[in-house]
């Protein structure tokens, strides 16, 4: 299967974070041609867009940045509101959840894939370290794959290489791709906008660091 994929084109939904950057290198390994798409939806930190641009430049990859600022107008959430504290809502879903974000992102990624002739769409969503985001579920992705293909009469394939990996396993994958140190130092996962190991205090940093420690312990590197 890999040899077939190597002759095809893919687009990666790319934020400059650990997961999507791991997907970038996964795509580079498995596809002949890869482009990136980043969505500017009014994130708390402009740094996220700049990090994505820098990584794309480092890797010499064509990078599309699309304006999705409408998202921040639809609903208040801690990913777009600078003065909102990050907490869990009554239903257990963190207030970092942006309703319909992945629905819209994959729709626009599909439209772009159609225009550039890419059959494959790669996204870093994951159920294993599940924050409660309903649009990260495997069932949603499978449904979206069918919807995009029907909507544009194209046989798209949405790939989720991290879907069943926990954070330690995601670090393992990056190590197998020989980019662990690059991802550790160059990506932005921190909700407080600090590149690399981050602030060490926010939920995203805790999850990332715990996974890294677990992986390094498993290989005897700590």
Curated annotation (Swiss-Prot):
GO BP of this protein: queuosine biosynthetic process
SUPFAM superfamilies hit by this protein: Adenine nucleotide alpha hydrolases-like
Cofactor annotation: Zn(2+)
Assembly mode: Homodimer.
Molecular function terms from GO: ATP binding; ligase activity, forming carbon-nitrogen bonds; zinc ion binding
Protein's UniProt name: 7-cyano-7-deazaguanine synthase
Role noted for this protein: Catalyzes the ATP-dependent conversion of 7-carboxy-7-deazaguanine (CDG) to 7-cyano-7-deazaguanine (preQ(0)).
Binding site for Zn(2+): 190, 199, 202, 205
Pfam families reported for this sequence: QueC
Keyword annotations from UniProtKB, A to Z: ATP-binding, Ligase, Metal-binding, Nucleotide-binding, Queuosine biosynthesis, Zinc
Binding site for ATP: 14-24
